[in-house]
């Protein structure tokens, strides 16, 4: 059993982990489905992040990087490339990853920091089955 599981390693999850550590929790686990921490911040290449927290303008990846560096100074554990399948009322998190396989992890507390996702081409009603050259903003920023 862990004290705190944070589902999502984006801005909310990173901030929650840092604050929980600052507040004295020591057995903290972040479960992130992507291969890296940062979430949507990794797609936000414009300035404007960090004014309140760090006193300077940062891009999304720079802002995420600051939190990631802060986490490295703690004992917060991170499992990347981990898909959460279910969260039960008795605070058991069912998840799966290549590295650890299928796991059921029990927690005293759970924070849901799953954030936002860009809607797919189909969800926004882009017509056709093969719209060559049509990319969402998030897809374009990845390449």
Model-derived features: where do they sit?
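FAD-binding core/adjacent interface of flavoenzyme oxidoreductases
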Residues: 1-7, 65-143
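Beta1-alpha1 glycine-rich phosphate/pyrophosphate-binding loop at the start
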Residues: 2-62
């Amino acid at each position: 059993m862990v004290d705190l599981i944070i589902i999502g390693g984006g801005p909310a999850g990173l901030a929650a982990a840092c604050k929980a550590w600052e507040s004295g929790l020591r057995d903290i686990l972040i479960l992130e489905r992507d291969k890296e921490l940062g979430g949507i911040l990794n797609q936000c290449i414009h300035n404007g992040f960090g004014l309140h927290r760090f006193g300077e303008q940062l891009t999304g990846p720079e802002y995420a990087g600051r939190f990631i560096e802060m986490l490295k100074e703690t004992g917060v554990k991170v499992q990347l490339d981990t898909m959460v399948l279910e969260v039960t009322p008795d605070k058991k998190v069912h998840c799966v990853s290549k590295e650890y396989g299928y796991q059921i992890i029990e927690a005293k507390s759970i924070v849901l920091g799953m954030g936002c996702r860009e809607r797919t081409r189909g969800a926004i009603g882009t017509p056709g089955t093969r719209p060559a050259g049509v990319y969402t903003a998030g897809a374009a920023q990845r390449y």
